[in-house]
Amino acid sequence: MACFAKGKTIIKDAHELRVKESDRIAIMTENLTEMGADVIDTDDGFIINSRSEDSIPVLHGAEINCSMDHRIAMTFAIAGLNADGETMITDSDCVDVSYPGFFAQFRGFKQLIERYFSKYVSPFMRKEYYEKIKKNLT
């Protein structure tokens, strides 16, 4: 979510994320950087500097290495929703460890977003954003 915010977001005091199923701090910073985010790895977290002037994230699709970490895979599935281009998550079946139905429900969520944009967003905004989101729904 910090990629969507204006300004600087600091995640700190998260030492334990270095010793979970994977080094989640390192993997998050690596993959966010791969998607175009301005991320700085710190000892106990990371810093995200917004590249957006109007809170619209500036992320692009990428191949995400989740290192068989279910939480990383789910995080980047969500991040990929608003990225330009396709986001591919390697070994995404690792989510079955904690949330076996995640991707089925996720597809349903993407369909809700598509319906919302087609029904409630003005044609002016829809032209610019709907195509971007629709591209990521397929």
Language-model region placement:
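Short, structured segments at the rim of ligand-binding sites
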Residues: 1-138
